[in-house]
Curated annotation (Swiss-Prot):
Sorted UniProt keywords: Arginine metabolism, Hydrolase
Function description: Catalyzes the hydrolysis of N(2)-succinylarginine into N(2)-succinylornithine, ammonia and CO(2).
Known catalytic reactions: N(2)-succinyl-L-arginine + 2 H2O + 2 H(+) = N(2)-succinyl-L-ornithine + 2 NH4(+) + CO2
The protein's name in its UniProt record: N-succinylarginine dihydrolase
Organism placement in taxonomy: Bacteria, Pseudomonadati, Pseudomonadota, Gammaproteobacteria, Legionellales
Length: 448
């Protein structure tokens, strides 16, 4: 039976803007209050999907969430008509209005953690939508992400959905951005590597914690997901992210490592006690594991964060053993990073034999590279057929979506534009049409 890795990319929403809402995300902070181009952001994302689809990969999308989040404004004390809510928030708490308008759901690597059916005791694909409690603008995504995933993967014969983990600091969960799966191929059972930044309960075993920026993922959350997903404990590793890396802007593990099948591309300063972590991987691997460790002399952590090298997608083309690195254009523009990539591609000791650079500047300026924009869902033929087909990409759908973006998306968005009530109605009109395009039914709150 064929097994595929479905890439589910987030379709960038109309309210994509730069507000610096994410502590520890250096790009987000550095570009706060800049003018964004939502139309360009969405089209760059669509072009990424088109590129991977035309390479022969299975490609889907997750639609944007309803924004602004009027219910969140209400919870925060802004009452009245939608226009009155927006006006009051803009005048008295513009940073809260910005959070309610956030388009950060486009980074679907944080939407959920997914376990392949070949890894689980009941042979079903398991989903846990992330609670994302570390940031207000991300926390609001959790419930709707769960609703979306339950709609798209609704067949209980194949899919198992779990409740969000408790919305507490002790079970803070950031989704698949802190999860890697290593295996001989997508069809084989794998080693599940969960990465966390802090342990909240019990004895604290680590001498160091990040000082400058917060750690987001807890060990308790990662352990709960592994239990709920019925993963074999002998095939699971929990690794602590290097707190020194977190303080340099590595807010998720997918900013400092990337895995695909039997290849693990990782910076030498990614983990606390990294030698032990890699030894565990080698010990558990019943397949020829290839670990490519990039030294700090080749690329520093700060250079990795600036260019998002490790937030590239590493993919295997159908019916081939070779892999392609899908990297942001910022990697090509940095001589040290490009030299490192050229060396990887030229090295016959690893299966990476080509690189493709993507222009994702609008997302990158907010701290999201190629890997941030996609949620990986391993599916066999039956599981792929059992899911909702309307969000699966082909060139015809991409053409329709491109016209939809050109119709509804602004080419410029400033923070002051969030005060314009017309933006709300533009968003609702667009989402109403999108649900028809993707055959999602009345899935948004305003449609019920």
């Amino acid at each position: 039976m064929n097994v595929y890795e479905l890439n589910m990319d987030g379709l960038v929403g109309q309210t994509h803007h730069y507000a610096g809402l994410s502590s520890g995300n250096i790009a987000s902070t550095n570009n706060a209050l800049s003018i964004s181009n939502p139309q360009a952001a969405a089209r760059q994302g669509l072009e990424k999907m088109r590129r991977l689809y035309n390479m022969g990969l299975k490609q889907g999308l997750l639609p944007p969430h309803q924004r602004p989040n009027l219910n969140l404004l209400y919870q925060l004390g802004f009452k009245g008509t939608p226009s009155e809510q927006i006006n009051k928030a803009y005048k008295t708490a513009p940073e809260l209005l910005s959070a309610c308008y956030s388009a950060s759901c486009m980074w679907t690597a944080n939407a959920a953690t997914v376990s392949a059916s070949v890894d689980t005791e009941d042979n079903k694909v398991h989903f846990t939508a992330a609670n994302l409690i570390s940031n207000l603008h991300r926390h609001q995504e959790a419930d709707f992400s769960k609703k979306l995933l339950e709609f798209i993967f609704s067949n209980s014969d194949y899919f198992n959905h779990h409740p969000l983990l408790p919305k507490s600091m002790g079970t803070s969960d950031e989704g698949a951005a802190n999860h890697n799966r290593l295996c001989q191929s997508h069809a084989h059972s794998g080693i599940n590597l969960f990465v966390y930044g802090k342990k909240v309960l019990g004895n604290h075993q680590f001498e160091q914690s990040p000082i400058k920026y917060p750690a987001r993922q807890t060990k308790e959350a990662s352990e709960a997901i592994a239990r709920n997903h019925l993963l074999n404990p002998e095939r699971v590793i929990f690794a602590c992210q290097n707190p020194l890396a977190i303080d340099q802007g590595v807010f998720h593990n997918d900013v400092i490592s990337v895995a695909n099948e039997h290849v693990f591309l990782v910076h030498e300063e990614a983990f606390y006690n990294q030698t032990y972590v890699l030894d565990q991987l080698r010990e558990k691997a019943d397949f020829p594991l290839v670990i490519i460790q990039i030294s700090k002399e080749q690329i520093s952590v700060s250079e990795a964060v600036d260019t998002y090298l490790f937030n590239s997608q590493l993919i295997t083309l159908p019916d081939q053993k070779n892999m392609i690195l899908i990297a942001p254009a910022e990697c090509q523009a940095n001589l040290k990073v490009k030299t490192c990539i050229d060396g990887l591609v030229a090295d016959p000791q690893n299966p990476i034999n080509s690189v493709y650079y993507l222009d994702l500047k609008q997302s990158m300026r907010n701290g999201g590279g190629p890997a941030c924009l996609r949620l990986r869902v391993p599916l066999n033929d039956y599981e792929l057929k059992a899911m909702h087909q309307g969000i699966l990409i082909d060139n015809d759908l991409l053409d329709i979506l491109d016209k939809w973006v050109l119709k509804y998306y602004r080419t410029e968005l400033k923070i002051s534009d969030l005060a314009d009530p017309q933006l709300l109605y533009e968003c609702l009109d667009a989402l109403d049409e999108l649900t028809q395009i993707l055959k999602l039914g009345s899935i948004y709150p305003f449609q019920s």
